[in-house]
Amino acid sequence: VRVRQRAKAISIAGNNQLLADGAMNNCGIGLGQLAVDMNTLEDAYTYEPEPKSFLYSPTYHVPPMSQRYYLDNKSSFAGLNFLHAFTKSSVLRVNALYYADTTVGEDSVFSRYVADDTVSIFENNRITDSRNTAKMSLAYELNTKKVYLSDRLTGSITWRDAANNNTTNIGKVEEFIYQKPRGLQNILTAELNTPSRLYSLSSVFRLYDNAESLSVVFGGDGSDSRMLKLKSTFMRNRVATVFDLFGNSLTLGYIMEHKHNNVAGTQSGHSSVSGYWIHTAEPMYEINFSGGSAEISLPVEYISCRYSWRDGRTARFMFSPHADASLKIGNLLTADVAVAYNQAADTDNPLTDGVVANNYRTYTKYPDSISVERTSLANLRLSYFDASSMFSCNVYAGWTHVRRDYYMKYLYAGDYTFATPEWHDNSRSSWSLVASLKKIYTRAGLSVDASCSYSYNKALASQNGIEDYLRYNAMNASLTTGWDKLSWINLSVTCAGNVSWKRHDCFSESGDLLKNVYYTVRMDVYPVSNVHAYSDFSQTTFEVSHGHYSTNCFWNAGVIYDVLKSLSLSVSAVNLLDRRVYEEAFYTGVNYQYYRTPLRGREMMVSVRLKF
């Protein structure tokens, strides 16, 4: 039996507002996004990603399709939002939520790692993944003519248990993963508007820790257990002011950033402690002129790092000039140009001086010092829009060249994978061309939206003692048309195709050419004002190997009947063709992967919606 339920209740009384929200389902619709959406209004200065987990499945893959076709889940969500207005300009918000989810994922994966001695690996995974998340936030906001202030304190904790019964090329393997990430974060933003200038302040402070454990049972050959613990402290503070210079805006900003990480449980046998301080001076000048505007940014950074496994500190300066301009060419055409040279330290994830077991077969020696990525880029965008004829066109051309001071070397064997950093200059480059147009024929009720793109990527690959640059090409074209001339029927059709290939290299003499085609048709019918019937059909064809294709077709339909303003009935059917298997193949670098997963099959649901 498939169940999908959701209920909301709203109470408004004087200066108080209360919203209660609850949902649960087991019909392939994950509710995790409801928990993510509680996050705050974060900008470039207050956003910092949480450290990635060390443990992961080596091959588990999420299909590029709607979850309702494949997700075997039991999900529930409960949220409570309270707002109290002290005055017209100041409010207090309290949010709390709890999210629980259990999914069962099955797939079969064949991977081919290309080298002088090509290694082939197969896995039949059955993963049961359970997550429970609790979050709470307290936010205060003040908004007056002279002062804007926002402060939000958020706390969260997640419990995750995952078990994988895996049949592999080395026999039966059972994996058990436990993770418990916890975080406490405060974000403060403020703006002070004075007659002479504008002052702004932003601050983020976060405490984070994660305990992870991995237990592996090899069929008949014993077991292995690992435990990792990460404790991380992060803060970033920025102050800036804006004032007039020669009739334009000059922004002067200063940023101070600090992070401290402690990783315990690697094969080094001791804790890996690392930390850094970054000080940034950030001048930016905006120029407005007849027919356009320009912006010049000249930030200078100083970073100082310390590691427990190394004496002393390492430090360096980084300069990242950036300039862009927007030009109006006539009344219909706009050109946007940007050039930049960015130097950025890779500070997102913790460093270690030991080897970490990521899963039953993958071991990684992570970088033991902060690396710097140097990016040169240039791009041009031309935009044409004619409101009188309802026609628009965009052309984009971009080039990027990235240099890093290390790259990862991979060693693939039948029973393990080992990744280690090689500290040597490493570069990758890409350029792309994209063109799109849209035309609306108002009298005919017809719209046409078309696009095409081409991209070229060059990157270094190193595995099993072979190193070479890979040169990949990809082309894509798509066309979408819609027709809504009649008020009681709407039609839309989308079709797209992709082709990817690479040049000859040391890993392969073939071009690794793969093609796929996709199209979807949707019809919405409104025979009377309170009845809405819909149907959609989609088909995707993947080339899984040279000359061999897999086709996936899906047909869905439904009817919604609004009996009253407060009552509606609906019937929906998903996967009417009862497609049971999804297949695809793709290249990751030089390596080939074939993927197969079971689908949920045909399902129908009757729904009742009440408002009161």
Name each region found by the language model.
Residues 65-71, 123-129, 173-179, 224-230, ...:
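Outer-membrane beta-barrel domain signature
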Residues 489-560:
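C-terminal beta-barrel architecture of Gram-negative outer-membrane proteins
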Residues 371-377, 398-410, 414-416, 420-436:
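Signature for the C-terminal beta-barrel architecture of outer-membrane proteins
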Residues 83-101, 129-310, 321, 328, ...:
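Face-selective signature of the C-terminal outer-membrane beta-barrel domain
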Residues 2-5, 72-78, 130-134, 180-184, ...:
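Residues that define the transmembrane beta-barrel architecture of outer-membrane proteins
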Residues 22, 31-37, 104-120, 161-170, ...:
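Outer-membrane beta-barrel translocator domains and adjoining extracellular loop/strand segments
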Residues 1-160, 175-204, 242-247, 289, ...:
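Membrane-proximal, glycine/serine-rich, low-complexity loop/turn segments characteristic
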Residues 1, 18-24, 298-306, 366-368, ...:
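Transmembrane beta-strand segments that form the barrel wall of outer-membrane beta-barrel proteins
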